[in-house]
Amino acid sequence: MLKEFKEFALKGNMIDLAIGVIIGGAFGGLVNSIVNDILMPIIGFITGGIDFSNMFIQLAGEKQATLSAAKTAGATISYGNFITLLINFLIIAWVLFLFVKGMNKIRRKQEKEESSKKMSLEEQLLSEIRDLLAKKK
């Protein structure tokens, strides 16, 4: 059983998946930093200094100034956090779309090259006939 697991774990697809997960985790951190440290301050500046991290609706208790205080006081709806996560998602989805589009373009180009290299059935038969005729002479 250990041998079977080793064969499974060391297959190319499993290793590729592990590498993808690691790169995805690092990419997620990078996107979070871009959104939180670059885009959200710019959006806040454009919208007149709105801080999305403290946008919330307090459902219970006294009105609080910050999200953390409001969560301590009672139930809250943190729609500012949702806006930030939505922007994160859109950036990741866009980058993945561009990556997949590029990979598909490369794959189509390779398939086209491979199909042009393969001879059709008629071409193969004509080549065989030519070779046979050349041997008879």
Curated annotation (Swiss-Prot):
It is found in: Cell inner membrane. Disulfide bonds: none annotated. PROSITE patterns: MSCL. The keyword Cell membrane applies. The keyword Membrane applies. Pfam families: MscL (PF01741). GO terms for molecular function: mechanosensitive monoatomic ion channel activity. Belongs to the MscL family. Channel that opens in response to stretch forces in the membrane lipid bilayer. May participate in the regulation of osmotic pressure changes within the cell. This is Large-conductance mechanosensitive channel. It comes from Bartonella quintana (strain Toulouse) (Rochalimaea quintana).
